[in-house]
């Protein structure tokens, strides 16, 4: 089939240097999947923690399903990530290093299953963010100059 994007975490690319990416599955309830099919999810401010040898995604907001009954899910509950033991151990070792964290980058459907792309990230300082903004501005100006030159 392919991939159908549910949501992106643009803030992660702004606040972190992404060093490594990997794909993980999610343990979800039925009403959560229905809400995700409607595109009602928010990855901003979410992060991954390892507890008792298991990986959990915190602060992932999935809006309650509109047509759900009293057994609807909680919007901000912690959700378990499906990763291999070696992957969890390697990520946990990197998290213990100073300045590293794991953030979700995007969520998508892959062959009918919900997947999350997580990234091993190191926080950016304020001057790094300014430097990135300068690079984007100069790149934008360059592309506009080339575009106007091609029109002539």
Curated annotation (Swiss-Prot):
Compositionally biased intervals (Polar residues): 141-152
Location of region: Disordered: 129-152
PANTHER family the UniProt entry points to: SSRA-BINDING PROTEIN, TMRNA-BINDING COMPONENT OF TRANS-TRANSLATION TAGGING COMPLEX
Major subcellular site: cytoplasm
Coiled-coil region(s): none
Organism annotation: Pelobacter propionicus (strain DSM 2379 / NBRC 103807 / OttBd1)
GO biological process: trans-translation
Database matches in HAMAP family: SmpB
Family: Belongs to the SmpB family.
Annotated function: Required for rescue of stalled ribosomes mediated by trans-translation. Binds to transfer-messenger RNA (tmRNA), required for stable association of tmRNA with ribosomes. tmRNA and SmpB together mimic tRNA shape, replacing the anticodon stem-loop with SmpB. tmRNA is encoded by the ssrA gene; the 2 termini fold to resemble tRNA(Ala) and it encodes a 'tag peptide', a short internal open reading frame. During trans-translation Ala-aminoacylated tmRNA acts like a tRNA, entering the A-site of stalled ribosomes, displacing the stalled mRNA.
Composition bias, Basic and acidic residues: 129-140
Gene name of the record: smpB
GO cellular component: cytosol
Classification via Gene3D superfamilies: 2.40.280.10
Source taxon at top rank: Bacteria
Pfam families referenced in this protein's UniProt entry, alphabetically: SmpB
Compartments (UniProt record): Cytoplasm
Protein name listed in UniProt: SsrA-binding protein
């Amino acid at each position: 089939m392919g991939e159908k994007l549910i949501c992106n975490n643009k803030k992660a690319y702004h606040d972190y240097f992404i060093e490594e990416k990997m794909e993980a599955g999610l343990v979800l309830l039925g009403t959560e999947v229905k809400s995700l099919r409607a595109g009602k999810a928010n990855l901003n401010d979410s992060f991954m923690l390892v507890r008792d040898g298991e990986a959990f995604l915190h602060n992932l907001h999935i809006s309650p399903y509109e047509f759900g009954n009293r057994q609807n899910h909680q919007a901000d509950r912690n959700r378990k990530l499906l990763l291999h033991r070696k992957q969890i151990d390697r990520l946990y070792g990197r998290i213990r290093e100073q300045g590293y964290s794991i953030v979700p980058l995007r969520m998508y459907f892959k062959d009918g299953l919900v997947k999350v792309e997580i990234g091993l990230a190191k926080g950016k300082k304020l001057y790094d963010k300014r430097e990135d903004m300068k690079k984007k501005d100069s790149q934008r100006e360059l592309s506009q100059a080339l575009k106007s030159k091609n029109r002539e």
